[in-house]
A protein has these predicted regions:
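Domain-level signal for soluble alpha/beta catalytic cores
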Residues: 1-381
Length: 381
């Protein structure tokens, strides 16, 4: 079992895919900007040796020789080494192989039919499916992705996976509603939604987790971005989490970003297999508002599980100083009363920031955690 220092650090999810990866995957010769990006980042984080044939092919303008799969492997190695060079205690591959978090898992299941694109926000769309039959997993997913990370990671890997509530909430629920034909009302719709969530959890997420655990995956982050959309369904989020993880031998955390977390309590606390809440705090932390005051809830409900403390605002290019990160950690520790509860991370994935900004944010986060650690060590002495 890995031993961590006080205030260990982790990432949450995706980072931006480098220009050279996107061009290389398409089989295009790298332009001057991509070539500079490739060489400069390799000099900084050392993700490929000079003799690597994929690297040599990209540098020579022969992306097709590197192959799309080979370029994706390099992208995953780049993200791993960026996180590790920054000093993170838990890492993954920046979701280098993933494009989104909904369509791919749904395509691994029977019982869904894709209907068309709908807008998620601004000019972003996703292909939405309807649940049209009983859920059945065709094949466990993220296995090869995890195998690669496990083989190459120097720090402990933490795999992110989309949770059952979000997959259900982002889909149309035709099958389970149809089972209650002739019935009307909110209670029936809620029962149908509960059945949908649990069906996905038991028939798809759980067997996927079992397959991942069998391959050595010991730490899993279950992402539930939809949890804050319908606060009155927080109990369904918890029930889906429990149905997916019950009896499995791994450490499970839940990531929810940008929500009024108060509205999810106390129902969410019934997610009994959740050992860590990885949440957003920095985005709401301003001179006029204490973004960490909400941590009082954990003392109020006597919940002593770990807190993945968001200390980096992922929606702003402003780079938090180590002093700001340190102050946020120490403020949170004072509110919680137990510094040992805290893991340190960005609010969410850093994919909307440039690689340079994301990297500097992470470097400052790790340094801020180190300073906070030193402060508490001094107090103990």
């Amino acid at each position: 079992m890995t031993t961590f220092p006080l205030f260990p650090t982790q990432e949450i999810g995706s980072i931006a895919k480098p220009r050279w990866q996107l061009q290389g995957q398409r089989g295009e010769p790298l332009d001057a900007k991509a070539l500079t990006e490739l060489t400069s980042w390799n000099d900084r984080v050392h993700f490929a040796p000079p003799e690597d044939p994929r690297l040599k092919a990209l540098l020579a303008g022969h992306s097709r020789e590197a192959g799309a799969a080979g370029v994706r492997d390099l992208g995953a190695l780049f993200a791993l080494r960026l996180f590790e060079t920054a000093g993170l205690d838990r890492v993954y591959d920046g979701e280098a192989r993933r494009i989104e978090m909904y369509e791919y898992p749904i395509r691994q299941m029977k019982g869904f039919q894709f209907l068309g694109h709908v807008r998620s926000f601004d000019n972003k769309y996703y292909l939405k499916a309807a649940g049209t039959g009983p859920i059945e997993l065709e094949r466990p997913y993220h296995l090869e992705e995890f195998d690669f990370v496990r083989a190459h990671a120097k720090a402990e890997p933490k795999l992110p996976i989309t949770g059952p509530y979000t997959l259900a909430d982002w889909s149309y629920n035709e099958y389970h509603l149809g089972k209650h034909s002739g019935w009307k009302g909110r209670a029936v719709r809620r029962r149908a939604q509960r059945d949908f969530v649990v069906d996905i959890a038991r028939q798809a997420i759980r067997p996927t987790l079992q397959a991942l655990i069998a391959r050595g995956c010991h730490v899993v982050q279950i992402d539930e971005p939809a949890a804050g959309t319908h606060p009155d369904e927080a109990d369904l989020v918890a029930e889906g989490f429990n149905a997916a993880t019950e009896g499995l031998d791994a450490e499970f955390s839940m990531h929810i970003c940008f929500s009024d977390y108060r509205s999810l309590f106390p129902a969410l606390l019934e997610a009994k297999r959740c050992s860590q809440w990885a949440w957003e705090f920095a985005n709401r932390d301003t001179e006029g508002r204490d973004g960490y005051a909400i941590l009082e809830m954990f003392r109020e409900y006597k919940d002593t599980r770990k807190i993945g403390l968001g200390v980096l605002d992922v929606h702003r290019d402003e780079v938090e100083t180590p002093e700001k990160v340190q102050e946020r950690i120490e403020r949170a520790a004072k509110i919680l009363g137990d510094p040992g509860q805290i893991w340190v991370n960005p609010d969410c994935g850093l994919r909307t920031r440039s690689l340079t900004i994301a990297n500097q944010k992470l470097l400052n986060m790790v340094e801020g955690a180190r300073r906070a650690r030193a402060t508490f060590a001094g107090r103990a002495a």
